[in-house]
Structures are given as C-alpha cells and as structure tokens.
C-alpha cells in the first residue's frame, strides 16, 4: 500500500473510533429475557424491570422482551413490577463479563387484595447458549475446596491447557501466546512475553479462560486470554483470613518449610457509595530443591524475627469504587507482587573447601590454604517486582448505550545478581572439569557469571462504547493504545578485569502500539452471530531501526529507511462466531478468526545497543507479526438438570513465528574482519511455522445429592518447525546438523490429557475433594554417546513416560458467632509419583562438553558425564550426577485454617 493511502486509512479508522468513546467492555455484562403472564403466557409490555442496588432498569417491549446493558459483573436481585400483577424478584442473578444472563419471568394477576412479592432464587443456566467459542468460567467457590492455591493452578486444570516447566501453553501454542488481563488492563510483560504479576485468589471474584473464538476486541494474542475480575467492596463488611503450612510434627522428606498467609477485607468507606476491598498474601518455601545457602536473620517492626527462604513471594491488592449514581461508576485499583528466590543449580550445589593454590576442592580443609566455599550462595539472587495501577470509568448513557474508559500503568523490575555484588566484584567460576579433575561438573570456586537488570513499563489507554440499536443488533467499537518503555543491562562473565563482561547487552528503547475494533452481535430467531473486524498498528520506534542499521552496515548492506511508514507494521483481523440453540438442551457454536501478535520485544531489540555481541543473535525491530488462523466447532448438551457435556474440535494454522536464521553477508564485510572469514551472523526473523488440531471434551456435574464433579479429556497434536526460536542459531553454532524440513512434535505436545475432579460434601459441615490428572509423555530428542551434534531427523522422535498426579483436600467447618471457620488438610501428589520434569537440567556454565542425558541408552535420569572420554578410553563410562531437578515436586502435605465473614 502506498504511504499516503496507508496514512489515510489509519487516520480515518482512528477518527471513526474516537468519534464515539473509548475502551473495552469487559467488566460488564447484560441481563435479557422475557416477562409474560403466568396464566396464558402473553407478553406483558411496559412491565418495569429493575436491577436492585444499581439504578439500572428498563421497560418490557411489546413482544415481552427486555434487555439491560452495561450491568457490572456481580450477583444481583432483579425485581419485576406491573400494575395488576404481583411483583416478583429473582435473587442471585449472576452477571458475567461480556456475557448475557437470560431470565424468563412470569407474573401472577392480582384481583382485589395486593399479593406479596414472590421471591425466586435464580440459577445460572446450565447451557450457555450465548457463547460462540470455548470459554471456561472458573468458580472461586470451586477453587476454594480444591488443591488450587494460585491462578496458574486454576488455569492448568482447564481443558486444552498444558503446564510445562512453569509455562502455560493453550491449545499447542507457545507460552508467550497467552495474555492475562485484570479488569481489562493487560498484566503480561510484552518484553519477555510472560505474566509476571501474581494475583491472589482471595482478591478475585471471577476467572475467565478463553481458548477459542476471541471477539474483535481482543488483539495481540494468538492462543489464549485469561481475564481476572477482582473483588469490590459490598454494602456490608466482609473478609477472609487463611493460613496454611506444612510445619506440623517432625519434619520429613515431605516437609518443604512452606507457609502461606492470605488476608482480604472490604466494605463501605465513609459513605455507602464509596466502597473498598484490599487483600494481601505471602508465600514462603524452601521447595523440594533445598539448598544449603546460609540466610541471615531479619527483623520486622523491631520485634518480628525471621529468615528468608529459598522462594519468597508476596502480592498486594487495593481497590476503591465510587458509585456516583446508578449510571456512573469510578474504580481505582493498585496491584503489586514480588518474588525473591535463589534457584537450585546442581553444578553449584557443593559445600566444602577450596584451595586456590592447590587447585583442589575437598569436604574439609586439608591445610591452611583451604577456605570455605558455599556453592549455592554463588548462584544469583533473582528478584522481580511487578506493579499495576489503573483507573476505570463506567457510564451508562441510557438503557441501551454505555461506555467504559480505562487508563493504566504496568511495570516490571527484574534483577539477577550474585550476593549483591557489582559486576566488577564478580569472580570467574572454576572451569571445573579442567581446573579440578576430581570434581567433574561441579563448580567449586567463583560466581555464576551472569548480572542482569531490566525494567519495562507499559502505559495503556483504552475505551469502548456499546449500543443496543434494537433487539437484533448490539454494536461495539473501541480504541486502545500502548506505549512501551524498555531499559536493559545484561552481562555475561563480568569480573574485576573486565567489569562489563562479554556479550554485553545494554539498551533503552521506546515503542508503541495502536489498535481499534468494530463488532456486531446479531441476535435473531435464537441464533447469535458475533462478527467483527480489528485493526492493529505497531511502531518499533526510529531509534531501534537506526540501531538495527548498524548491524546491516556491519554485514556490508545498506541500512533500512527509518521513516514512520516504512518501519510500522499493521494488520486487519476478521472474526466470526455463531451460536445456535438446537433445543432447550442443545446448543451448537462455530468460530473463525485471524489472530496477530507482535514478537516479544526482547527479540526485537537484543544487542541493538552495541555491535560486540559475538555470534549471538541480533534483534530485528522490523519483524512482521506472528499469525494464527483458527477454526473451532463445538456443541453443548444438557443430559439432566445437573449434568452437562461440552465437546469442541479445533484447528490452528500458525506461521511467521519467531526463529533465528543465518544472516546474509557481503564478502569482506566488517563482520568478517571482526570475527573471522568463516563467521556467520545470526538474526531473529519470522521463520517458524506449525499447526495444532484437537478435540476437547468436558462433562460437568453440578452439586446435588451431596456431590459434584467433572471430567475433561483433550486429544491434540501440536507440531511445528521448531519448539525453540534459537534453533537456527544452533545450526550455525554446530549443535544441530541442519534445520528440520518437516513439522515435528513440539516440546509441550501431550497427545492425551485427562483431568477428573470429585467433591463430596455435607454443606456447612465437611467436604472432601479429589483431583486426578494424567497426560501422556512429552516428546524428547534421543542423545547418542559422544555425538556433539544433534541430528535433525531425531528431534522429538521419542516420548517420555506418562505423567500422573493425585491431589486431595478435606475440610471440617463450624459456625462460630454466625461466621464460618474451616480446618483443612491438603495433600499434593499423594501417591508420590516421580514425574519427569527435565532429562538434563541446564549445567551452564559448567563443563557441558561431557555432560549429557544418558536416558536414551541407559533409561536413567539425572544426567551423567562420560569418564571414558575424559580419560581417552574407547568405552563409554557414565558417571551419574543424580540431579534432583529431573523430577517434579514430590508428595507434600499441608494443614490450614480459614475464617470467612
């Protein structure tokens, strides 16, 4: 497209969106339904429908239908009144984000005397005829009775979700393809592509997981949306206190020194229109990977003494809302979380004595030249702090029109430092397999050679307007802009002789993103159609492109034009979803969409601040957006009043994923002069591709007759050209013989995943929950003895053993002073299953040359080094290292108490 046409298109689209209002209607829903006479079913036009406590309401139309737009997410009482009929109220009407709650109300006629108001308790329809894609609404009451203590654990229990190495994959996509929002503001770090901010379950009222059929309002995401709705203060004071620990009785192998305390409290403040809710949570644990690192005692407030543990996490939340009237509402919220931990590294696990003169390590000092060396203390202390502050304004202009405006700031501060040292205070670690032959693999002197500090800030402004034009069309349009500020300092091998280290990466860049959408929800004859169009524009910034030009000049090519219309990337995304109720017990849905996502900013800007990065990959700010085309069809069926099934089939075509590729080079270029005539540069580019297909099944039994439960099953195949964006770099570096020429199973591909949940309870007295999850093994690449180069044909050609976990939770409840107190016990992995987490956890910067997996030939885990090769012998002599990181968390029991009021 010509530059002037592109500018005209962007300007017109922005003007059309700004002509309305701004945002993202995500924390509001809709109440709709019919009001008829109980006697003959005739429509009762002009009946008055009110949502109590909100000031929202409407009149019934001639056909008996009504719709109330812009109802904040929550639980309400709906009252219906009409002259000549007894008023009726429906209690516990649940309104969910971006969804319609259907009500069918019948009024009885009055004759002479006035009848009392009839009260009816509403239940959420077991069939969601409004949904056009896969959506999982996670009930917070459900998580409270299960062995679920974090948002991540709640999401991992859903169909189509795989939790691998602490990263969430939805329907076979890469982990960075999942975005998380709190009340419509993104809390995913665009720099590294993950979700850093931890939100306590005690602060949440709702979790929504979208894995297919996203509306046009969702952009810059390919695989999944996680919507979190935080609690608001109610008209009365309420709160929760929960404490959990595994410190009971004598410590044994199931003891991880775990403590978890969470608090929440809210209610009216000064006036009934001003309300608040605040929560806090702390979690401390030494984990099952206990290190011997000494930790000094600290003091809090002058009298509380404690020691930090291997992992230390906290989260804070504070939210204030003011209801100006039933039509206007302002919410201001702060969210913060942090974690400080020392990761376990097997090569640094030795504690003993080192002699720099003798070049020898031993368990005790052999003479005066030996000094104490705590290996675990010389791994980095990693500290992350995440903060989000936002302001949300909701305004209902009429029963059919409302808008929402949001302004937010999200920041991440990350530090990775050994013993709080400056880079010039680092000591280069021992090259262990050469420095001390008696201690192969283990580091016995020096520091982990990595020093890192980065900060990323994202400013967000967004808004939308929703208009119910008539009973058929609901129009929604909006605009969003994000501004990113990035500051990175990353050093490898810094020390007193070279304070800046090698491969140093230092930069400061700003970039921004603009998006808008228009969608129409069409309802007619029971059918719902969601059709939308989205526009996204990304500008990496002139500074980044000019820095990238230094790389091009280094390789002998002219630089790129850094002008606005040359450096910006834009896309238009169509979305379509259809739902059709076949009967009162069946509903069919289908959706199609194109989803674009800019690569994470880390790979766009890496090493653009300087040109001395060696042969590591250059960032590329001119990369295109990654693309996913998704199709889905599903059906819901209600078997009984409490039993419902949901089946969905999906297919994803993925291309333009981030990968690495040997860069072009002009003969005699400055790059060859700097690194040698055979050196090859590596650059990030849109190289990788893949596909995912699968079927999901969920059977849910609502609570009745003292039990509830669910069964989910997912069959999927996730294949692609690469699981690792650095695969091309490995080819250049000699770690891989060639790039694969066909799609291969991805690292997180688990073909069969089953999850079951059974809850048995006597309400108000006791309860017991059992969770069982099972998945077939993930793929792995066979490693053959003394082969330094992996064969592309063998990548992920075999599979590990299946993974299985059983968790239980049992509680006993009492009513004390009218409030509920619960004592509970939680068992995790109660069968102590040894599930494989990793065949060969990283050993860098140790002697990796002789360290590898010997699972392929010996079927043993934990990694080993080949003593025969080190001694120059022809036979292979494996010396096992028994790295505990190869297994996931073993059995652990916890006890706790909670108090709700």
What are these regions (language model features)?
Residues 303, 448-452, 457-460, 468, ...:
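Signature of Gram-negative outer-membrane beta-barrel scaffolds
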Residues 242, 650-653, 670-782:
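Gram-negative outer-membrane beta-barrel transporters
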Residues 23-121, 125-126, 162:
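Periplasm-facing N-terminal accessory domains of Gram-negative outer-membrane beta-barrel systems
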Residues 289-307, 344-379, 419-449, 493-504, ...:
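Solvent-exposed loop segments that connect transmembrane elements
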Residues 765-769, 773-787, 812-901:
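C-terminal beta-signal and adjacent terminal beta-strands/loops
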Residues 404, 408, 587-589, 593, ...:
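Membrane-embedded beta-barrel scaffold of Gram-negative outer-membrane proteins
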Residues 255-345, 381-403, 574:
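Transmembrane beta-barrel wall of Gram-negative outer-membrane proteins
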Residues 86, 94-103, 116-216, 220-225, ...:
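Periplasmic N-terminal accessory/gating domains of Gram-negative outer-membrane beta-barrel systems
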């Amino acid at each position: 497209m010509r530059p002037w046409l592109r500018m005209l298109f962007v300007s017109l689209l922005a003007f059309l969106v700004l002509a309305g209002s701004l945002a993202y209607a995500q924390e509001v829903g809709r109440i709709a339904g019919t009001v008829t006479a109980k006697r003959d079913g005739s429509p009762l036009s002009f009946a008055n429908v009110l949502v109590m406590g909100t000031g929202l309401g409407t009149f019934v139309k001639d056909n008996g239908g009504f719709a109330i737009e812009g109802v904040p997410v929550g639980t309400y009482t709906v009252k219906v009144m009409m002259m000549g009929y007894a008023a009726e109220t429906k209690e516990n009407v649940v309104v969910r984000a971006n969804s319609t709650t259907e009500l069918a109300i019948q009024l009885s006629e009055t004759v002479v005397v006035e009848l009392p108001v009839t009260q009816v308790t509403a239940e959420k329809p077991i069939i969601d005829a409004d949904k056009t894609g896969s959506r999982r609404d996670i009930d917070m009451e459900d998580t409270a009775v299960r062995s679920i203590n974090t948002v991540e654990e709640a999401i991992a229990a859903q169909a189509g979700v795989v939790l691998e190495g602490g990263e969430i994959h939805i329907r076979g996509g890469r982990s960075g393809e999942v975005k998380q929002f709190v009340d419509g503001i993104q809390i995913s770090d665009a720099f590294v592509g993950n979700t850093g901010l931890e939100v306590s379950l005690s602060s949440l009222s709702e979790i929504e997981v979208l894995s297919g059929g996203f509306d046009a309002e969702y952009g810059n995401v390919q695989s999944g949306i996680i919507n979190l709705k935080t609690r608001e203060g109610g008209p009365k004071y309420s709160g929760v206190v929960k404490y959990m620990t595994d410190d009971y009785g004598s410590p044994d192998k199931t003891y991880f020194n775990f403590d978890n305390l969470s608090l929440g409290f809210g209610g009216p403040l000064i006036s009934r229109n001003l309300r608040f809710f605040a929560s806090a949570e702390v979690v401390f644990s030494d984990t099952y990977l206990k290190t011997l690192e000494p930790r000094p005692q600290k003091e809090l407030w002058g009298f509380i003494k404690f020691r930090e543990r291997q992992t230390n996490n906290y989260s804070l939340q504070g939210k204030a809302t003011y209801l100006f009237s039933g039509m206007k509402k302002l919410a201001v919220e702060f969210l913060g979380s942090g974690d400080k931990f020392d990761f376990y590294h097997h090569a640094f696990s030795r504690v003993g004595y080192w002699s720099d003169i003798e070049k020898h390590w031993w368990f005790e000092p052999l003479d005066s030249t030996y000094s104490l060396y705590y290996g675990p203390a010389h791994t980095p202390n990693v500290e992350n702090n995440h903060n989000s502050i936002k302001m949300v304004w909701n305004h209902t202009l009429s029963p059919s029109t409302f808008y929402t405006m949001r302004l937010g700031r999200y920041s991440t501060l990350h530090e990775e430092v050994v013993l709080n040292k400056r880079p010039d205070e680092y000591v280069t670690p021992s090259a262990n397999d050469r420095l001390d032959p008696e201690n192969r693999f283990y580091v016995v002197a020096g520091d982990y050679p990595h020093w890192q500090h980065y900060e990323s800030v994202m400013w967000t402004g967004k808004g939308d307007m929703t208009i119910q034009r008539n009973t058929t069309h609901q129009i929604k349009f909006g605009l969003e802009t994000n501004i990113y500020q990035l500051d990175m300092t990353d050093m490898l091998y810094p020390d007193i002789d070279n304070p800046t280290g090698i491969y140093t990466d230092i930069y400061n860049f700003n970039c921004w993103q603009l998006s808008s959408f228009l969608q129409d929800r069409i309802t007619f004859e029971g059918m719902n159609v969601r059709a939308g169009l989205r526009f996204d524009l990304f500008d990496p910034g002139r500074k980044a492109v000019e820095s990238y030009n230094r790389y091009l000049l280094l390789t002998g090519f002219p630089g790129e034009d850094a002008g606005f219309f040359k450096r910006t990337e834009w896309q238009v995304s169509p979305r379509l979803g259809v739902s059709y109720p076949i009967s009162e017990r069946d509903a069919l849905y289908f959706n199609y969409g194109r989803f674009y996502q800019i690569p994470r900013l880390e790979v766009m800007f890496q090493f653009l601040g300087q040109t001395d990065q060696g042969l590591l990959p250059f960032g590329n700010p001119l990369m295109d957006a990654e693309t996913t085309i998704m199709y889905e069809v599903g059906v819901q069926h209600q078997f009984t009043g409490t039993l419902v099934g949901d089946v969905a089939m999906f297919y994803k075509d993925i291309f333009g994923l981030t990968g690495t590729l040997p860069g072009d080079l002009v003969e005699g270029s400055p790059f060859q002069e700097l690194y040698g005539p055979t050196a090859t540069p590596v650059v990030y580019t849109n190289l990788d591709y893949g596909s995912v297909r699968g079927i999901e099944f969920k059977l849910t039994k609502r609570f009745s007759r003292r039990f509830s439960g669910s069964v989910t099953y997912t069959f999927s195949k996730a294949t692609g050209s690469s699981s690792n964006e650095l695969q091309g770099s490995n080819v250049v570096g000699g770690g891989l013989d060639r790039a694969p020429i066909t799609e291969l199973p991805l690292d997180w591909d688990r073909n069969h995943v089953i999850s079951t949940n059974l809850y048995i309870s006597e309400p108000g007295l006791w309860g017991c929950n059992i969770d069982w999850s099972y998945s077939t093994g993930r793929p792995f690449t066979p490693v053959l003895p003394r082969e330094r180069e992996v064969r592309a044909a063998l990548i992920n050609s075999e599979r590990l053993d299946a993974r299985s976990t059983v968790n239980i939770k049992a509680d006993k409840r009492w009513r004390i002073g009218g409030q509920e107190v619960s004592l509970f016990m939680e068992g995790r992995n109660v069968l102590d299953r040894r599930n494989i987490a990793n065949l060969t956890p990283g050993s860098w910067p140790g002697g990796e040359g002789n360290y590898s997996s010997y699972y392929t030939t010996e079927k043993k885990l934990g990694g080993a080094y080949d003593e025969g090769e080190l001694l120059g012998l022809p036979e292979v002599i494996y010396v096992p290292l028994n790295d505990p990181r190869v297994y996931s968390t073993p059995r652990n029991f916890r006890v706790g108490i909670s108090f709700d009021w």
